[in-house]
Amino acid sequence: MNFEGKLIGKELKVVIVVSRFNDFITGRLLEGAKDTLIRHDVNEDNIDVAFVPGAFEIPLVAKKLASSGNYDAVITLGCVIRGATSHFDYVCNEVAKGVSKVNDQTNVPVIFGILTTESIEQAVERAGTKAGNKGAEAAVSAIEMANLLKSIKA
C-alpha cells in the first residue's frame, strides 16, 4: 500500500505562526504562504495567523495551536540572520529542536519555514526573489503532510 499526500487544500484548516522580528522578510514569507494556500483551494476563512515576537517564541505557540485540535497543519515562519555573536547558533538550534518536538508531541504536521541565513541578502533571496519563497514552499508541505496524515488515519 502506498500513502501519498495530495496537494488539494479544500476543507483544510491551517494556522501560520510568524515572527515579527525581521518583518521585512517574514512579511514576504507570510504573503507567499497565504497565497499558496489559497491557490491550492484552502478557504481564506480557514487560514489563521498568530504573530510572535521572535523565532524563539514560535515553538511554544505552535504547540498550543497544534494541541488545540482546531488545525490540520501548522506553518512556522521566521527569519534568523547571523550576527557578530553566537546568539544565532543558540536560537537556530533551539527553534529547530522545538518545532521538531511539537511534531512528535502533537501528531499535527508543523512545517519548518524559518530562514536561518548568513546575511540579509540570503534572506531576501529566499523570501520571494532568486531562491523562491520559502513561505510558499512551507505551505505546499503543510497541505501535503495534512492530507498524508489523513490518508494514514483512514
UniProtKB/Swiss-Prot annotation:
Question: What pathway is it annotated to?
Answer: Cofactor biosynthesis; riboflavin biosynthesis; riboflavin from 2-hydroxy-3-oxobutyl phosphate and 5-amino-6-(D-ribitylamino)uracil: step 1/2
Which keywords fit this entry according to its UniProt record?
Riboflavin biosynthesis, Transferase
Q: Which residues bind 5-amino-6-(D-ribitylamino)uracil?
A: F21, A55, F56, E57, C79, V80, I81, F112
Query: Signal peptide location in the record?
Result: none
- One GO process term, biological-process aspect: riboflavin biosynthetic process
- Chain positions recorded as (2S)-2-hydroxy-3-oxobutyl phosphate binding sites: A84, T85, R126
Question: What job does this protein perform?
Answer: Catalyzes the formation of 6,7-dimethyl-8-ribityllumazine by condensation of 5-amino-6-(D-ribitylamino)uracil with 3,4-dihydroxy-2-butanone 4-phosphate. This is the penultimate step in the biosynthesis of riboflavin.
Q: What is this protein called?
A: 6,7-dimethyl-8-ribityllumazine synthase
Which species expresses this protein natively? Staphylococcus aureus (strain MRSA252)
